């Protein structure tokens, strides 16, 4: 990766109606992993769709976490509330927005 580039992991889950609060408790990690720089939770209101966006310092950090027992436990805790899931990993950079 080049300087000023980050690894972005985006996961989208459609959850069962009425389970958002339970899902959210299961989804939040017990400890935030080394290498995770930022994390966002986005909810698409009435569609029961939750998008997680995490920013990582390297592909290795993200992969280490993905394969960890903490992530396995978290995924197992979320499973009863999830109908569908998809995810992708991207390398990106922050765009500088001009300020007038």
What are these regions (language model features)?
Residues 1-72, 77-100:
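Short S/T/G/P-rich N-terminal loop/turn motif that feeds into the first structured element of a domain
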């Amino acid at each position: 990766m080049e300087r000023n580039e980050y690894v972005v992991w985006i996961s989208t889950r459609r959850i069962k109606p009425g389970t958002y609060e339970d899902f959210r408790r299961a989804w939040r990690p017990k400890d935030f992993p080394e290498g995770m720089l930022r994390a966002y939770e986005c909810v698409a209101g009435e569609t029961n769709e939750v998008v997680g966006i995490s920013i990582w310092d390297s592909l290795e950090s993200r992969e280490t976490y993905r394969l960890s027992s903490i992530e396995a436990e978290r995924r197992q805790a979320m499973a009863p509330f999830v109908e569908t899931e998809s995810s992708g990993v991207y390398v990106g950079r922050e765009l500088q927005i001009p300020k007038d």
